[in-house]
Amino acid sequence: MGKGKPRGLNAARKLSNHRREQRWADLHYKKRLLGTAFKSSPFGGASHAKGIVLEKVGVEAKQPNSAIRKCVKVQLIKNGKKVTAFVPNDGCLNFIDENDEVLLAGFGRKGKAKGDIPGVRFKVVKVSGVGLLALWKEKKEKPRS
């Protein structure tokens, strides 16, 4: 039989020390304490970020799907990092031009890519201060500049 955990009147220090050491095996705990979200993620811990469109790109979907997902390469204003962002809805890529200012949000789960789009962790929400969904539904027009 294994030894198991210490059980005794004077075992509290041993138990709490062991728990403290074992917590570092938990990914979420480690990320929170080391501040990884602020250091490594392009958004720096924020939910949204603005950027300038560098180019339009088509990203091939992963197997077993066969499609070219419409995306844009964006340089973030806050730190100059370059990211790829997904453009949702059919024909929305036509509303986005190079050098436009776009607002990006997270896409997928906990900073990972979503579905069959490899390496794309963000999606476009606004173009030139106008919501992409409003443009798509023809409720608003993109401002001329």
From Swiss-Prot:
<dbReference type="GO" id="GO:0005840">
    <property type="term" value="C:ribosome"/>
</dbReference>
<dbReference type="GO" id="GO:0003735">
    <property type="term" value="F:structural constituent of ribosome"/>
</dbReference>
<comment type="similarity">
    <text>Belongs to the universal ribosomal protein uS12 family.</text>
</comment>
<keyword id="KW-0689">Ribosomal protein</keyword>
<dbReference type="GO" id="GO:0006412">
    <property type="term" value="P:translation"/>
</dbReference>
<keyword id="KW-0687">Ribonucleoprotein</keyword>
<feature type="modified residue" description="Hydroxyproline">
    <location>
        <position position="64"/>
    </location>
</feature>
<protein>
    <recommendedName>
        <fullName>Small ribosomal subunit protein uS12</fullName>
    </recommendedName>
</protein>
<dbReference type="GO" id="GO:0022627">
    <property type="term" value="C:cytosolic small ribosomal subunit"/>
</dbReference>
<keyword id="KW-0379">Hydroxylation</keyword>
<dbReference type="InterPro" id="IPR006032">
    <property type="entry name" value="Ribosomal_uS12"/>
</dbReference>
<dbReference type="InterPro" id="IPR012340">
    <property type="entry name" value="NA-bd_OB-fold"/>
</dbReference>
<dbReference type="InterPro" id="IPR005680">
    <property type="entry name" value="Ribosomal_uS12_euk/arc"/>
</dbReference>
<dbReference type="Pfam" id="PF00164">
    <property type="entry name" value="Ribosom_S12_S23"/>
</dbReference>
